[in-house]
C-alpha cells in the first residue's frame, strides 16, 4: 500500500484545498438535509372494503368475504390475509411479506385489484364494491380542528372546507382530508298511523320524489344569433318545494308537507365524529409529499393558519391538534444537543490523555469527518432523523479511534527522536493497514441490519451507510489529514531521545502481563467460567422489542360491545371527557374520535377501521410525568366510571406499531371452537401477575330480531319477501328516494317513519305493510323473535380468529408475552386439528425481525473472516481473533442487568457493533505482535511488548467509545444499544 501520509505531506496545498471544500460542503449539506422525527418505512398492507346492505355478518362472510379472500390467496409475496366482517360490511387486509421488494409493491397491488374484479361477477346482487386503499401508510403529520360554539355542523364543515382548499396550495402538501364531517340529509318522516290510514304506499312517495328531482336536458334551439338552451324548472330548490310535492293516492291528492314532517339535518345515525377539548369539531388532516422538507412545510403552514384564523367568522376557531414539524424540530434539536455533548466528551478525553497539541489534532479531525459524512448523506438522500443522528453519535465514539491511534504513534516516534516527517510516515506504515482492516470489520458488524428485511431493519436502515461512511472517512482523515495537522501542531519538549514506556505505570503493567502469561491456564479457565456464567444470566435480561417513546401523547381507546350504537359510544366518551376536564392542569389539549380512530399522525400509529362501538382519544399531556399520571387516572376510572367500555391506554411507539404488549392469535375451523379455545388462553393470560385488561378482540354476540315470513300469507296478499324487506328498510332505516342540490353539495332525500314509530321495539309487529287491498300489520304475515347473532367475525388466512390481548406492567414487554405463550404449551399440545395458538403483535414482529436479522450473519462472518485472513495470514490467528469477540458478552450482560436495560432490536445491533470493535482492537494488537516477531523477538516478549505499545491507544479509543455513548444511554430508543456497546 502506498504511503498516503507521505503523499499528503508532499502535496499539502491539495489536501488543504479538500479540507476547505469538505468543511464548507458539510455546512451547506447539513443545512440542506431533510428533517424527520422517525425514518420512514413501508407498510406493506392494502385495505379492501365491500358492503352488502341487509346482509348478516355470517351471510357477508360466506358470500363476499370468503370469495374475495380465496382469490387474494394468489397474491405474490403474500404474508397473511385478515378480515373483519360485520352485518352488511367487510374489511379485508392483505399484507405482503417484509422481503417483498419496494419496487414490486405497486404492481402487486394492481394484481390484487385485478383479483377483486375477477371475483366481482361472482358476488351477489346488491354488493357495493370492492374498494381498494393502497395508501394506508399516508402520514397526516399536521392536524387542525375547526370549532365554534354557536355554529352548526354544516357551518363548521364549510369553514373547514375553505381551510382545506387554502392548505392544498401550500408547497409540499400532498393530501388534505376532512375528519369528523357530519353529512346532511333531507328527511321525509311520516307517522305509522297516518301512513296506514291514508293507504299511501311508501313506494308512491318515493316514485313521486324521484320523478320530480330528475335532471334532464330540455333541448336547445339553433338561431341565427346562436344556440339557445331550454331550462325546464322542476328540481327542488328549497324544502318548501319538497313540502309542496303532490302525492296521489286512492283518487285523492295530498301535499307531501301535509302528511309528513320534512327537515334538513345531520345524518341519523350520525357519521363518525371529532371533538376538540370536548367541543364538536371538524378536523383537517395534512400529509406531506415524499421528499418534502417538513420544517419548511411547518413554517408555511404556520404563516397560512395565522392568516386563516383572522379570516374565520367571529366565534369560530382554528386549533392546532398535531404539529409534526414542531415535534421534528424539537427532536432534531435534542439529538444535535446530544451529539454536541458527545463531541465535547470525546474531545475532553483526547485533551486530557494526549495533551493540548496532540488532543487538538484529534479535535480538528472530528468536525471534518462529520462534515464529509453530511455531504455523503446529502448525496445519498439520507435525512436527519432519530436513526441517522443516533448513528452519528455511535460513529463518533468510533471515528476518533483511527485519529488517536495515528497521532499517538506519531507522538511516540517523535519522543524516540524522529523528525516530524519521518514520524508521520512511520505511523502510516505501522498502523494504516490494521486500522483499515479494523474499520472494515467494524462496518461489517452492521451488515445484518443493512441487508436484512423486515420493518425493524427498514426502520434502522440508515445505520449501516451513516456509520460506514463516517468510519471510512475517519480512516482517510487519520492517514492523510491527522498527520498534516500533527506535522504543524505536535511538538516534543527537549531533543533528547527517551523511551515513553519506561515509566512506573508501564513497568507495573509489564509485571501484570508477565504474571498472566505465567498462569495462563488459570486466566483462561477463569475467563471461560465468567463467560459461561454470563451466558446463563443472559435470559434474565428484560426483553422489549422497541420501547415506547417519550412523546407527550397518550392514546386511549374505548370499545363497547358489538352492536352498540354511536350514541352509546358518545355517552361513554362524554364520561371520559368529564374525567379529562377534571385533570385539565395536566393536559395541553385532547381530541376525541367517536366511531373512528385517529388518522395516522405518526408512522408508528396504527389506525383502525371505523366502527360505531369504538372511540379513540389522543391526549397531549404537558410532559411525560403528566402523561404517566393521566394514564394511571384513566386506568383507575376504567373500573369505576367507564364500566360500559373496555378501556386501553397506549403510548406512541418508537418502532413498528403493535396494539398491545401481549397478543396471541387463536384460529380454528369454526367460530364456536375458536371462542372456546380463546377463553382458555384468556384465562391463562389473566393468571399472569404482570397482565392487566385481558380481553378478546371479538367474541360477544350482537342483538337481533328475526322476522320469519309466512310464505302462504305472502302469496295471499300478493307480496314477496323482497317487497317486505324493502318496506321494512324504508320505514325503519330510511331509503334514499331522491336528491337535493345545494351549492356544491348533493343531499339525499330519505323517506322513513317518525322516530317514535321506528325505535319502539314493542310496536315493531304493527309496522304497516302496503298490499293491493290496503295496509296490514307486519305480525299478520310474519313471526318475530329475539336472537343473538355474530355482530363481528374476524378471520386470519380464511379461518375464524380471535386475538387474546392484554396490557402488562411497565417494563415487562415481550417477557410477559413469551411467558404467557409458554404457559399455553399444554393447551397447544391437545388442540384439535386445524386449531392453532400463535404469537402476534410485538412478539411476532420481534421473531420475524430477528429471523431476518440472522440471515445475513453468515455473510457478515465470511466477510470478517476474509478480512482477517488478508490481515493476519493464518487460520490460527484468525480463529484467535474471532474468539475474542464473544467475550464482549460478559460486559454486555453485566451492564444490561445493572442498568435494568431491555434487550431488544437496537441492543442486538449494539452487540454486533461491539463484536466488530473488539475484533478491530484484536487485529491491531495481533498485527503489532507479528511485527515484533518479524523483528526477531520471542513470541512471549513480542506479546508483552506489543500489549504495552498498544495499551494507551486501545485504552484511549475504548474510553472515547464508552464516554461517547454516555449521552445516548439516557435516550429511551438508543439507550440499550449504548449500554451494550459501553
Feature roles, as predicted:
Residues 1-35, 431, 497-546, 587:
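Signature of alpha-helical transmembrane segments and their immediate interfacial
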Residues 5, 23, 59-135, 193-214, ...:
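Solvent-exposed, membrane-proximal periplasmic/extracellular interface segments of envelope transport
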Residues 7, 16, 49, 166-344, ...:
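Extracytoplasmic/periplasmic membrane-proximal domains and adjacent transmembrane bundles
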Residues 13, 21-55, 117-126, 378, ...:
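Transmembrane helices with small-residue packing motifs
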Residues 26-32, 317, 344-411, 864-950, ...:
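Hydrophobic transmembrane alpha-helices and their membrane-interface caps
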Residues 35-46, 83-89, 126-149, 177-183, ...:
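Flexible hinge/switch segments at interdomain interfaces of large molecular machines
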Residues 321, 328, 332, 407, ...:
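Helix-loop junctions and hydrophobic alpha-helical segments within the transmembrane domains
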Residues 396-410, 431-451, 458-497, 617, ...:
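Transmembrane alpha-helices and their membrane-interface boundaries in multi-pass membrane transporters
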Amino acid at each position: 500500500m502506498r504511503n498516503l501520509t507521505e503523499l499528503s505531506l508532499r502535496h499539502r496545498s491539495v489536501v488543504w484545498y479538500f479540507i476547505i471544500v469538505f468543511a464548507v460542503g458539510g455546512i451547506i449539506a447539513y443545512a440542506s438535509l431533510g428533517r424527520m422525527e422517525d425514518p420512514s418505512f413501508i407498510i406493506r398492507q392494502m385495505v379492501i372494503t365491500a358492503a352488502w346492505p341487509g346482509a348478516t355478518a355470517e351471510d357477508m362472510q360466506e358470500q363476499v368475504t370468503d370469495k374475495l379472500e380465496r382469490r387474494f390467496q394468489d397474491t405474490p409475496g403474500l404474508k397473511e390475509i385478515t378480515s373483519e366482517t360485520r352485518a352488511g360490511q367487510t374489511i379485508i387486509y392483505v399484507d405482503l411479506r417484509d422481503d417483498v421488494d419496494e419496487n414490486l409493491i405497486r404492481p402487486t397491488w394492481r394484481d390484487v385489484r385485478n383479483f377483486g374484479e375477477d371475483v366481482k361477477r361472482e358476488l351477489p346482487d346488491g354488493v357495493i364494491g370492492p374498494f381498494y386503499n393502497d395508501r394506508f401508510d399516508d402520514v397526516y403529520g399536521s392536524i387542525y380542528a375547526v370549532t365554534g360554539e354557536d355554529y352548526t355542523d354544516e357551518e363548521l364543515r364549510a369553514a373547514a372546507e375553505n381551510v382545506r382548499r387554502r392548505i392544498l396550495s401550500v408547497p409540499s402538501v400532498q393530501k388534505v382530508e376532512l375528519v369528523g364531517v357530519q353529512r346532511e340529509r333531507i328527511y321525509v318522516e311520516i307517522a305509522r298511523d297516518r301512513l296506514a290510514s291514508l293507504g299511501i304506499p311508501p313506494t308512491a312517495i318515493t316514485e313521486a320524489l324521484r320523478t320530480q328531482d330528475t335532471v334532464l336536458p330540455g333541448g336547445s334551439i339553433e338561431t341565427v344569433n346562436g344556440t339557445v338552451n331550454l331550462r325546464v324548472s322542476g328540481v327542488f330548490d328549497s324544502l318548501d318545494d319538497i313540502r309542496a310535492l303532490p302525492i296521489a293516492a286512492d283518487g285523492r291528492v295530498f301535499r307531501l308537507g301535509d302528511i309528513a314532517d320534512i327537515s334538513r339535518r345531520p345524518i341519523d345515525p350520525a357519521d363518525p365524529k371529532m371533538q376538540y377539548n370536548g367541543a364538536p369539531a371538524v378536523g383537517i388532516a395534512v400529509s406531506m409529499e415524499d421528499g418534502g422538507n417538513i420544517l419548511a412545510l411547518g413554517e408555511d403552514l404556520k404563516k397560512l393558519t395565522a392568516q386563516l384564523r383572522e379570516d374565520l367568522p367571529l366565534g369560530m376557531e382554528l386549533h392546532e391538534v398535531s404539529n409534526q414539524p414542531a415535534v421534528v424540530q424539537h427532536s432534531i434539536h435534542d439529538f444535535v444537543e446530544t451529539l454536541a455533548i458527545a463531541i465535547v466528551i470525546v474531545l475532553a478525553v483526547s485533551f486530557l490523555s494526549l495533551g493540548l497539541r496532540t488532543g487538538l489534532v484529534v479535535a480538528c479531525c472530528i468536525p471534518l469527518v462529520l462534515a464529509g459524512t453530511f455531504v455523503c448523506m446529502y448525496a445519498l438522500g439520507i435525512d436527519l432523523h432519530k436513526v441517522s443522528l443516533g448513528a452519528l453519535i455511535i460513529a463518533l465514539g468510533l471515528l476518533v479511534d483511527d485519529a488517536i491511534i495515528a497521532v499517538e504513534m506519531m507522538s511516540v516516534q517523535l519522543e524516540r527522536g524522529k523528525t516530524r516527517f519521518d514520524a508521520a510516515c512511520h505511523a502510516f506504515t505501522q498502523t494504516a493497514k490494521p486500522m483499515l482492516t479494523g474499520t472494515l470489520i467494524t462496518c461489517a458488524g452492521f451488515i445484518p441490519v443493512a441487508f436484512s428485511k423486515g420493518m425493524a431493519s427498514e426502520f434502522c436502515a440508515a445505520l449501516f451507510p451513516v456509520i460506514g461512511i463516517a468510519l471510512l472517512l475517519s480512516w482517510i482523515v487519520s492517514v492523510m489529514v491527522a498527520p498534516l495537522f500533527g506535522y504543524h501542531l505536535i511538538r516534543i519538549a527537549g531533543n533528547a531521545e527517551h523511551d515513553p514506556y519506561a515509566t512506573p505505570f508501564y513497568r507495573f503493567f509489564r509485571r501484570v502481563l508477565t504474571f498472566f502469561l505465567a498462569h495462563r491456564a488459570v486466566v483462561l479457565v477463569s475467563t471461560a467460567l465468567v463467560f459461561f456464567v454470563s451466558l446463563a444470566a443472559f435470559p434474565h435480561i428484560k426483553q422489549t422489542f422497541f420501547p415506547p417513546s417519550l412523546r407527550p401523547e397518550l392514546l386511549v381507546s374505548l370499545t363497547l360491545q358489538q352492536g352498540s350504537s354511536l350514541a352509546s359510544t358518545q355517552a361513554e366518551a362524554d364520561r371520559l371527557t368529564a374525567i379529562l376536564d377534571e385533570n385539565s392542569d395536566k393536559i395541553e389539549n385532547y381530541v376525541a374520535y367517536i366511531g373512528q380512530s385517529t388518522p395516522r399522525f405518526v408512522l408508528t400509529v396504527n389506525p383502525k377501521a371505523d366502527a360505531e362501538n369504538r372511540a379513540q382519544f389522543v391526549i397531549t399531556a404537558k410532559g411525560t410525568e403528566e402523561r404517566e399520571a393521566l394514564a394511571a387516572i384513566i386506568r383507575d376510572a376504567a373500573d369505576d366510571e367507564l364500566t360500559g367500555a373496555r378501556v386501553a391506554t397506549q403510548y406512541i411507539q418508537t418502532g413498528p406499531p403493535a396494539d398491545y404488549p401481549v397478543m396471541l392469535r387463536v384460529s380454528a375451523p369454526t367460530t364456536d371452537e375458536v371462542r372456546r379455545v380463546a377463553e382458555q388462553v384468556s384465562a391463562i393470560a389473566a393468571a399472569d401477575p404482570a397482565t392487566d385488561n385481558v380481553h378478546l378482540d371479538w367474541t360477544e354476540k350482537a342483538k337481533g330480531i328475526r322476522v320469519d315470513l309466512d310464505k302462504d300469507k305472502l302469496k295471499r296478499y300478493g307480496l314477496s319477501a323482497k317487497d317486505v324487506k324493502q318496506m321494512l328498510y324504508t320505514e325503519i332505516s330510511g331509503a334514499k328516494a331522491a336528491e337535493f342540490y345545494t351549492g356544491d353539495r348533493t343531499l339525499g332525500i330519505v323517506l322513513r317513519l317518525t322516530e317514535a314509530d321506528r325505535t319502539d321495539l314493542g310496536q315493531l309487529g304493527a309496522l304497516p305493510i302496503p298490499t293491493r287491498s290496503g295496509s296490514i300489520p307486519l305480525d299478520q304475515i310474519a313471526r318475530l323473535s329475539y336472537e343473538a347473532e355474530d355482530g363481528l367475525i374476524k378471520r386470519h388466512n380464511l379461518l375464524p380468529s380471535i386475538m387474546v390481548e392484554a396490557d402488562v406492567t411497565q417494563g415487562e414487554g415481550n417477557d410477559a408475552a413469551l411467558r404467557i405463550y409458554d404457559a399455553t404449551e399444554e393447551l397447544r399440545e391437545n388442540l384439535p386439528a386445524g386449531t392453532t395458538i400463535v404469537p402476534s403483535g410485538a412478539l411476532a414482529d420481534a421473531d420475524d425481525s430477528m429471523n431476518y436479522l440472522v440471515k445475513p450473519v453468515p455473510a457478515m462472518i465470511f466477510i470478517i473472516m476474509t478480512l482477517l485472513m488478508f490481515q493476519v495470514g493464518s487460520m490460527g490467528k484468525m480463529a484467535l481473533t474471532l474468539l475474542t469477540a464473544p467475550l464482549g458478552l460478559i460486559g454486555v450482560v453485566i451492564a444490561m442487568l445493572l442498568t435494568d436495560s431491555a434487550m431488544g432490536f437496537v441492543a442486538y445491533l449494539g452487540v454486533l457493533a461491539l463484536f466488530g470493535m473488539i475484533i478491530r482492537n484484536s487485529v491491531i494488537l495481533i498485527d503489532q505482535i507479528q511485527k515484533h516477531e518479524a523483528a526477531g523477538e520471542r513470541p512471549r516478549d513480542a506479546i508483552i511488548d506489543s500489549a504495552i505499545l498498544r495499551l494507551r491507544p486501545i485504552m484511549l479509543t475504548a474510553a472515547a467509545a464508552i464516554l461517547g455513548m454516555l449521552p445516548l444511554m439516557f435516550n429511551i430508543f438508543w439507550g440499550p444499544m449504548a449500554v451494550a456497546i459501553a
